[in-house]
Each structure stands twice: as structure tokens, then as C-alpha cells.
Amino acid sequence: MALVKGTNSYVTVAEADSYFAERLHSETWSGASPTDKEKALITATSLLDQKPWVGEAEDELQPLAFPRIGYYYDPKYGRDLDLIDTPERVVKATYELALHLLSNDVMAASSTVKSLSVGPISLQQISTSKEPSKLDELISPLLENSGSLSW
């Protein structure tokens, strides 16, 4: 299926090309074929749409998670913003995740183990991540309960 903004992607290839033209370390994007760029944007949108976003879909039949009814607090602006349009954070997350998908084998997750011991009490956290950490920063204000990401 071809990329259709608002149906299976939050952005067009042309918008992504413009975004990455101004960014360092985006050679993977500029070197990808138009078909692979479309696939990456469609897949990124699909993955992002699986998140527990705040608010509710504006129309129960809409193909994507946005637009939504509701508000979220954006620390960048220091105030609540409405969800009637796709937030800038989701658009940027779509670009960044698409680049990540082109650059990495997302099936091979990286694991991080963190542990803390105080006397007889020991805590251990194992984090498996397939997404760039930048995504958490971008979209966490829009997630229900502002939880951390997991794919």
C-alpha cells in the first residue's frame, strides 16, 4: 500500500526529506529508496499508534490514533495543548523512529540491566529496548500515566 498521510502515516516522504535535510547523521535516510522511506514511515506510524495515548480518538472510525479529543501538558511550552491536530512531538517521533527502523535491526533488542543493593534489599531492573531513547523524551508527555516506552 502506498503512503497516504492521515491514513497510514503521520507525515509524507517529502516532509521527512525536509526534516532530515537539516539534521546531522541522517545519511541512512537520504540514501534510502523512496519505497523504503515510505515503508519506514508507515511502520513507524503503526508502531506509534500502539501506544496508550492520552485522550480519545476524535472519530472511532479514523485510521490513525490522532487527532484526539483531550489535552496534554507539554513541558516545552509549560502549558496544556489540545490534541485536535497531530502533535509536533508525534510528527518528530515518526521521523526519528522511521530513521531508526532503516538504520537498525529492530528485531534484535538491546538489554540493559540495572541493579541496586542496600543491605539485604536488592532491586534489579532489566530493560529491553528496540527504540531510540529520544522517543521516550518526545512522546512521554502524550502517554497515559506518562509511562515509559516498550514495544
Regions found by a protein language model. Give the residues of each.
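Divalent metal-cofactor coordination and adjacent catalytic microenvironments
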Residues: M1-W151
